[in-house]
Design a protein with these regions (language model features):
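Membrane-proximal bilayer-interacting regions
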Residues: 421, 433-435, 476
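Extended amphipathic alpha-helical segments with heptad-repeat/coiled-coil character used for oligomerization
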Residues: 425-432, 438-444
Length: 536
């Protein structure tokens, strides 16, 4: 008789080794299996970066006049903040976390289908609402650990939240899935009169358009669609508070002038004036039009550097660990989103990464952000490992929603993963396993993505009758013909961008900006415009 050793669950940040996977070699392979957490340093935008601004510009008027097209800022948010979570490795989303059905979320699948999604017969959701949690609008399984994590971080005005789920197949364990939608979001946000022009971009955010926790063209683990990428908008890499602080580092200027912001700004303004005089006297390129564009970019770099120095008294303003709306205050007005145990435990790096990016995006310093969480290739032959990692992801997602609620601003959060997992029906009856099905292998046919939307004015209003885009078959596999997104990751991104635009009431611009890949777009829009007053 052959004896099989029962698999043990792994700590929340332990690396994953699978007999059916090659030893990880590349950085992306190491991230999805949890060997690397995606840590690193920030790349401060150079003067050639075309990041947009919205600071209350205090820079001298003659400096602004050097390049009128150089956007220095506005007095409020310009678009709804957008944060995406890239769960590297192929996480479970469908069934055990977000409910999916053969038409809508409560259109039940077969018993065998739910078993494949890790749910034994006594945990199957029903159309009557058994094992269903609908507090956030979008329906989750009542025992979802991702939902448990969201709720543990997010308590303020939960009823102002709703969302949608998209059954969509994607390849397992590969960063080559073009999942990341941030460039599409940026093209819409920076468009002028419904048209995007890299050389004539509008106003969006204060310091940079995009921010991500990885040093990649997408800012995350998964790629961005190649036809949407804009080299000048490559996400600035931030994954810790010191990176965020470094975004407004003026070098030794502040030290030289005893941290006097006004003097430092005047020095930078003087440099801008000298540079402008010099540029007017030389020819940099033989092509006159190209020469003019290059000089405008150089002038804009100096103008923006002056504006940043004039607008920020200290890098402390970007540090999430110094923000009592995140860390808590002595008066008890703000309970900590991440407490001392969170920030001294094994998930400290992921929580600080999330806090750094959410603060930049939700305060309007960046337009959109991507947080990569590694180690989601968790088909380890037991369930507890996946449950703990789903809970951690939920804590990070919930933190973003809570921070938006505390600042009274809207937020769209989007969660995706490269592929997914499936269960063979065996259960993990340990305390952490909860009697749910063990994850035994990759399975791209069970994959899906989802979004949660927070609206300070009340729960987002459905545009139709369902919260699901596309359908599942009763055996819990994606019906690949049910939506343009179901079997095409590029069109999955288009679908997400469409729904983001619709939250602003701008879906009519979609074809001009993104093409006609989705056909009749009305059927794929899940929510009406939030009607948020961006001038307030």
């Amino acid at each position: 008789m052959t004896l099989h050793k029962k698999p043990k669950h792994l700590p929340s940040n332990a690396p994953l080794l699978h007999a059916d996977h090659p030893r990880p070699v590349t950085r992306r392979e190491m991230i999805r299996q949890g060997f690397l957490g995606g840590v690193g340093t920030a790349f401060i935008p150079s003067m050639f970066s075309l990041f947009t601004g919205r600071a209350n510009a205090l820079v001298a008027s003659d400096i602004q006049d050097m390049n009128p097209a150089c956007t220095l800022g506005t007095e409020s948010l310009q678009k709804i903040p957008f944060i995406c979570f890239d769960l590297a490795g192929g996480a479970n989303i469908a069934g055990s976390n977000v409910l999916v059905g053969f038409n809508d979320q409560r259109d039940v699948l077969s018993t065998a289908g739910y078993s494949k999604l890790g749910l034994p017969p006594d945990m199957i959701p029903t159309s009557a609402g058994d094992n269903v949690d609908s507090e956030l609008g979008l329906e989750f399984h009542a025992t979802s650990q991702m939902l448990a994590g969201i709720k543990d971080s997010f308590s303020t005005n939960r009823g102002n939240t709703d969302g949608f789920v998209i059954p969509a197949r994607s390849e397992n364990d590969t960063a080559n899935n073009p999942h990341n939608p941030m460039y599409g979001i940026a093209r819409y946000a920076l468009a002028q009169n419904g048209s995007f022009d890299e050389n004539n971009m509008g106003s969006w955010a204060q310091l940079m358009a995009l921010v991500g926790s990885r040093s990649s063209m997408s800012g995350g683990n998964s790629m961005a669609p190649a036809d949407l990428m804009v080299s000048s908008l490559q996400p600035t890499k931030v994954d810790r508070p010191s990176d965020a602080r470094g975004l407004i580092n003026t070098g030794s200027l502040m030290t030289l002038f005893n941290n006097d912001t006004a003097v430092a700004a005047q020095v930078l303004e003087a440099m801008a004036r000298m540079s402008d005089d010099k540029l007017g006297a030389i020819q940099l390129l033989t092509d006159n039009a190209a020469d003019a564009r290059l000089k405008d970019m150089i002038r804009c770099g100096y103008v923006k550097a002056s504006d940043i120095a004039a607008s920020f008294s200290s890098p402390d303003i970007l540090d999430p660990t110094l923000d009592e709306r995140i860390m808590g205050d002595d008066q008890g007005n703000y309970p900590p989103i991440f407490n001392g145990d969170d920030l001294s435990g094994p998930n400290r790096g992921d929580y600080l990464k999330t806090a750094s990016i959410m603060k930049l995006v939700i305060e309007g310093r960046a337009g959109a952000g991507c947080v990569t969480l590694g180690g989601y290739d968790y088909h380890t032959g037991e369930r507890a490992t996946g449950e703990q990692r789903d809970y951690k992801a939920g804590r990070c997602i919930g933190a973003c929603l809570e921070y938006a609620a505390r600042l009274n601003v809207p937020l769209m959060v989007y969660i995706f993963s490269d592929g997914s997992v499936a269960s063979n029906g065996m259960t993990d009856d340990s305390m952490l396993g909860g009697g749910k099905g063990v994850w035994t292998g990759d399975n791209s046919s069970t994959a899906c993505s989802f979004s949660l939307i927070y609206n300070p004015g009340g729960r987002p209003q459905l545009a139709g009758t369902t919260r699901q885009i596309g359908t599942m078959r009763t055996d819990a596999s994606v019906n690949t013909g049910s939506s343009p997104a179901a079997n095409n990751v590029n069109q999955l991104v288009d679908t997400v961008v469409l729904n983001y635009m619709a939250l602003h009431g701008d879906q009519g611009q979609f074809a001009n900006l993104m093409g006609n890949s989705l056909g009749n777009i009305d059927q794929w829009i899940k929510f009406q415009s939030l009607g948020y007053n961006f001038a307030g």
